[in-house]
Amino acid sequence: MHIFSAIPLALRRSAAWLCVVFASAGGLHAQTAPAAPASSASPGAPTAQKPYKLRIVGGLAGISQYTRQEEPFWNKELARLSGGRFEAEIVPFDRAGVPGSEMLRLLQLGVVPFGTTLMSSFTAQYPEYTAPDLAGLNPDIATLKTTLAAFRPYLEKALRDQHGVEALAIYVYPAQVVFCKKPLRTLAELSGRRIRVSSSTQADFVGALGGVPVLTGFAQIVPSLTAGNTECAITGTMSGNTLGLPSITSHVHALPITWGLAVFGANQTAWTALPPDLRALLRRELPRLEAAIWEESERETADGMACNRGAASCAAGTKGRMTLVPVSPQDERSRQDILSSTVLPRWVQRCGNRCVDIWNQTIGPVRGLVATSAVSK
């Protein structure tokens, strides 16, 4: 009782809601059902035992990462791969009453033994972890892969040592691009426009272009555009299509402003308590799930763009008639200049001078970009 009382009220509410969500399956934590009592079995008959079952909090509901990859893996593939010895039940975090900003803390406490947390949710408390997806840093997915590869050893060690969380996989969402209601030829023409953003780093990028960043929730993108509160919106290529943006915006710029990374992690105590053969299976199979999600994200980024402009190759979305604005040499120069002069320095300001060393020892060398200490005021 003392331990639970020490947990902040918001986290206790999340824990209570998760218990309700998983109640029909017997609770949140991994468990095995006990063997049938010997008295109920015939002499010499094998003892029946129920599968060992995991409770997983997954990523965002309703998107391909979850519906085509995470959910099938945990609900079906785990049992198939283990010959029925292990099973799992998964619920998306945004339908489980779990605040995205609290997921890391819930993992650390063990309230959520196994869960997916958006790295953008670290901005307020742990801005150092957001480094690999700064706005303008990764103009394509190949660059993002090398950026993350340079940062990953630091991230995994920090999560393990500072939070007691074992990072088992890192997922990616499709590219976040700019949709606009009025004609657009270059990024420079975003100056003066009110633009929906979803993170501090996107706001830094938009502000450096002379635009007006408007922090807006995903569900409010369409109402905000329709009401005229915003003129443009940064969102995923396919999620924008799903929202119906081709019917209310006319131009979409090809440059990925950000992507969106998520960590699938385990509370260390819960992880080490798993049967060794289950840990081995997950160590083998989760990298394959990660690779499949990255491939899915790359396909969906391209398909979203194809659908928005009404290309014949559109497969999963609704064909629109949008104008695709290519990345011009001027746009590429702007991206590089804004990244080095605004986005990176603002991240250092939020993160503190300790993050200068983190950057310069991880991402900086592979991107050819040196961070410097914030100037004291």
Residue ranges and their predicted role:
Residues A6, G26-L28, P34:
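Intrinsic low-complexity/disordered segments
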Residues P139-E156:
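A gly/proline- and charged-residue-enriched helix-loop-helix capping module
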Residues H2, A23, A30:
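Extended interaction regions within the primary functional domain
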Residues R13-G26:
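Bacterial N-terminal signal peptides
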Residues Q31-A142, R160-Q162, E166-K377:
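N-terminal secretory/targeting leader peptides
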Residues M1-A10:
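N-terminal secretory signal peptides that target proteins for export/translocation
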